[in-house]
From Swiss-Prot:
InterPro entries: Kazal-type_SerProtInhib, Kazal_dom, Kazal_dom_sf, Prot_inh_Kazal-m. PROSITE patterns: KAZAL_1, KAZAL_2. Residues 3-51 form the Kazal-like domain. It is found in: Secreted. This is Ovomucoid. Pfam families: Kazal_1 (PF00050). One of its GO terms (molecular function) is serine-type endopeptidase inhibitor activity. Gene3D superfamilies: 3.30.60.30. Its main location: secreted. One of its GO terms (cellular component) is extracellular region. Keywords: Disulfide bond, Glycoprotein, Protease inhibitor, Repeat, Secreted, Serine protease inhibitor.
Length: 51
């Protein structure tokens, strides 16, 4: 599974809840929050859902 993070980072994210687990073992609330972390911290997707 991959997440397309082109167009990120964004200045603000919605409150939509669709959890993604990052390689830093942190659960991100949605694609926007995850993709911002990808750009800032070079995180990768571990799996969909909470960590």
């Amino acid at each position: 599974v991959t997440v397309d993070c082109s167009g990120y980072p964004k200045p603000a994210c919605t409150l939509e809840y669709f959890p993604l687990c990052g390689s830093d073992n942190q659960t991100y609330a949605n694609k926007c929050a995850f993709c911002n972390a990808v750009v800032e911290k070079n995180v990768t997707l571990r799996h969909l859902g909470k960590c």
